[in-house]
Design a protein with these regions (language model features):
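Hydrophobic alpha-helical membrane-insertion segments
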Residues: 26, 30, 141-143, 219, ...
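C-terminal beta-sandwich/jelly-roll accessory domains of carbohydrate-active enzymes
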Residues: 333-335, 339-438
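Metallocarboxypeptidase
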Residues: 67-327, 332-333, 337-341, 366-391
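Generic marker of residues within folded, mature protein domains
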Residues: 12, 77, 121, 199, ...
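Extracellular structured ligand-interaction cores
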Residues: 10-15, 82-84, 128-130, 203-208, ...
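Surface-exposed loop and adjacent secondary-structure segments within mature catalytic domains
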Residues: 1-101, 195-199
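Residues in and immediately flanking transmembrane alpha helices
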Residues: 34, 145-147, 223, 348, ...
Length: 438
């Protein structure tokens, strides 16, 4: 849909499949002032013109398309995009307008896809973790986009690393903090993102997975793999600067494993606006944006396995024991023991606990004739999980049973069983009955 304006603004080349081959490629136009030349090692590739390049054939590169607006044969440029939205800049957390961040939308959650996502998560407070899938780069990204790791509570940072490391191990994707290693400019931050909003607003662990790296698949790993140290990643910088040998390696990969697909040889074409041009170059949508079909299942299987594994870490209430002790004269002492069987605590994250974003456990009792001791409804606290333990028992002070709660009542039995409920927004709901007789 049109954005930021409903009507086209400005003139220039608008992307379009002008030669009818079903692809959006590049057009190269011979021009003595052009910034590009054919690579001497493989003339299919275009490389930047050097200072000393005074003679030879040079080109201008334009996206494949048609001219929009009034055509001037002396001035060529790409037209402003008609669809310039970026939904991952439209979430409410630290949202900034178009004048500060392009693609952000007219106001926070203005776009229906984002708004429905926000409303769904706000109405489903049981969500403990959230993953959004994008393409491309072959990385697992985590908060924050706007602040360094020191801004995260230590326990949450430890859990982000623990969860992310497992995904990184299974997929081969590096685990990155966006602020440290996935910024487009060292002087600016990405804002209005899904994962920052989920973590900050809901206190849920959140991830953005950029599926697929054709560069790594082609064996180009320097600055792009799990062994790369912080500050040395090239996921964004590669498109601004890389040795031509790496592009030749990528081209060889296409020749050897994709039957040449991924790169289209330059073909002469009589353009209706520009006259004679050549159309060809990298097929970005096929090669970079998405895994080619032959690689798709192998790329997605470990990601699916990781997401299922993440869900297994969520808090989960279980009834450990219930005890009915007769006291005589129709009185009973009733005791209920409930555990958190999950790896995460019932509150999920320190962010949620500090922000009071998750209610404590609620316990309800009904069906008795008279309540002698205890409360019909109780608002209790949270239960810890396994993640609160250190990785090694060295210097460990011992394990408290902080994963467990015990509730007791003294009641006079009624005509039927005494029912109990235990409820928690994130850890689930339990129901049962004490077997007592009047």
């Amino acid at each position: 849909r049109p954005y930021p304006f409903a009507d086209p603004v400005g003139s220039g080349i608008e992307p379009q499949d002008v030669d009818g081959n079903g692809k959006l490629l590049w057009m190269r136009v011979s021009d003595p002032r052009g910034a590009w030349k054919a690579c001497s090692e493989d003339p299919r590739l275009m490389v930047r013109r050097e200072v000393e390049d005074r003679e030879g054939t040079f080109y201008r590169l334009l996206p494949e398309g048609r001219w929009r607006g009034d055509y001037d044969p002396h001035v060529h440029q790409s037209a402003p995009s008609l669809q310039a939205l970026d939904l991952n800049r439209n979430f409410p957390h630290r949202w900034r307008g178009e004048h500060q961040q392009s693609g952000a939308g007219p106001y926070p959650a203005s776009e229906p896809e984002v708004r429905h996502c926000v409303e769904f998560l706000m109405n489903h407070r049981n969500v403990c973790q959230a993953v959004t899938f994008h393409t491309f780069s072959g990385v697992i990204l985590r908060p924050y986009s706007t602040e360094p790791d020191e801004a995260l509570p230590k326990g949450d940072l430890d859990n982000f690393k623990y969860f992310g490391d497992r995904g990184s191990h299974w997929t081969g994707y590096p685990l990155l903090c966006v602020y440290h290693d996935f910024r487009y400019s060292p002087k600016d931050n990405i804002t209005g993102t899904f994962d920052d909003w989920v973590y900050e607003t809901l206190g849920a662990y959140s991830w953005t997975v950029e599926i697929w790296s054709v560069l790594r698949k082609a064996g180009i790993t320097s600055g792009l793999d799990r062994q790369t140290r912080r500050g040395e990643h090239r996921f964004i910088g590669w498109f601004e600067e890389h040795p031509v040998e790496e592009e030749m390696q990528l081209l060889q990969f296409c020749d050897d494993h994709l039957e040449g697909k991924g790169f289209v040889n330059w073909e002469t074409f009589q353009h209706p606006d520009l006259g004679p041009v050549e159309i060809g170059g990298w097929d970005m949508f096929y090669l970079f944006r998405n895994p080619p079909i032959k690689f798709l299942e192998a790329e997605l299987e470990p990601l699916t396995r990781w997401v299922v594994w993440l869900a297994q870490a969520n808090p989960r209430l279980v009834m450990a024991e219930q005890i009915e002790t007769p006291l005589g004269d129709g009185l009973y002492r009733l005791e209920l023991v409930v555990d958190n069987a999950g790896w995460l605590p019932t509150y999920g994250s320190q962010k949620a606990l500090e922000g009071k974003l998750v209610r404590g456990i609620r316990v309800e009792l009904s069906g008795f004739s008279q309540l002698i001791e205890g409360k019909r409804e109780q608002q209790l606290g949270q239960l810890e999980g396994i993640c609160s333990r250190p990785v090694s028992p060295l210097w460990h002070k011992g394990d408290a049973s902080d994963y467990r709660l015990k509730v007791s009542w003294v009641v006079r039995a009624g005509q039927g069983p005494v029912s109990w409920k235990v409820l928690h927004d994130r850890a689930g709901r339990l129901e049962g009955q004490f077997l007592v007789q009047k």
